[in-house]
Amino acid sequence: MAGALCPGSFDPVTNGHLDVFTRAAAQFDEVVVTVMINPNKKGMFDVEERMELLRETTAHLPNVRVASWRGLLVDFAREQGITAIVKGLRDATDFGYELQMAQMNKKLSGVDTFFIATNPAFSFLSSSLVKEVATYGGDVSDMLPPVVHKRLLDRIAERRG
């Protein structure tokens, strides 16, 4: 197979995301982990910080690269010559939303979406939940790559002053 995009906000990247990237990298020649820029969302980490953390956590995957994009994902796919999108699915709610997006992307551009069922060990994980639990002092160390865990705790401490 050729290349695939793995899009998301990745604020921050979790072990669940990393599992999807690893599995996608085993199926595609190239995987472009794409930080989608949403100017209406104020993240814990800015886009450059997220990209840096993604590069660090995917460095062991030689066919994975990191990029960012503002706009329609299918426009980025077209620009990159990529014809596939890979999304991890945690549950039926994810499926309903992602299926609708996949059908729209197919209609707009012909790009196919491939779904990877999330490893059950990570099926409850979301970046939002991890940030919330960490903010209140919960232990999320086994939910994040070590470098991300450290940066998250540092950022929470910075915000507390």
Swiss-Prot record:
InterPro entries: Cyt_trans-like, PPAT, Rossmann-like_a/b/a_fold. Substrate binds at S9, K41, L73, K87. Gene3D superfamilies: HUPs. ATP binds at S9, F10, H17, G88, L89, R90, E98, F122, S123, F124, L125, S126, S127, S128. It comes from the Bacteria. It catalyses: (R)-4'-phosphopantetheine + ATP + H(+) = 3'-dephospho-CoA + diphosphate. Its cofactor is Mg(2+). It is found in: Cytoplasm. Keywords: ATP-binding, Coenzyme A biosynthesis, Cytoplasm, Magnesium, Nucleotide-binding, Nucleotidyltransferase, Transferase. GO terms for molecular function: ATP binding; pantetheine-phosphate adenylyltransferase activity. Pathway: Cofactor biosynthesis; coenzyme A biosynthesis; CoA from (R)-pantothenate: step 4/5. GO terms for cellular component: cytoplasm. Pfam families: CTP_transf_like. Its EC number is 2.7.7.3. Disulfide bonds: none annotated. The record marks H17 as: Transition state stabilizer. It is an enzyme of class 2 (transferase). The keyword Metal-binding does not apply. PANTHER family: PHOSPHOPANTETHEINE ADENYLYLTRANSFERASE. Homohexamer. NCBIfam families: coaD_prev_kdtB, cyt_tran_rel. HAMAP family: PPAT_bact (MF_00151). This is Phosphopantetheine adenylyltransferase. The gene is coaD.
